[in-house]
C-alpha cells in the first residue's frame, strides 16, 4: 500500500482539502472516487486530482 493524496476543491468555501488514502500501487481513478464516496461528503462530481506520496503538485489556470 502507498499513500495517495486526493485533493478536492470545496466549492462552498473555495478551499482545497487534501486527504491521504492508503491504496495499492496500481490504483485507478475509480479507486479514488470510491474512497471519496465512502470517506467524505464529496463525490466524483467534484473537481479533484491525485498524486503519489513523493510529489504533490498544484496546477493553476
Show where each model-derived region lies:
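Short, mixed-charge low-complexity intrinsically disordered segments
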Residues: 33-61
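N-terminal acidic leader/helix
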Residues: 2-26, 30
Amino acid at each position: 500500500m502507498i499513500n495517495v493524496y486526493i485533493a478536492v476543491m470545496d466549492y462552498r468555501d473555495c478551499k482545497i482539502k487534501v486527504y491521504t488514502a492508503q491504496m495499492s500501487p496500481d490504483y485507478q481513478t475509480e479507486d479514488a472516487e470510491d474512497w471519496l464516496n465512502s470517506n467524505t461528503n464529496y463525490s466524483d462530481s467534484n473537481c479533484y486530482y491525485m498524486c503519489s506520496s513523493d510529489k504533490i503538485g498544484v496546477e493553476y489556470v
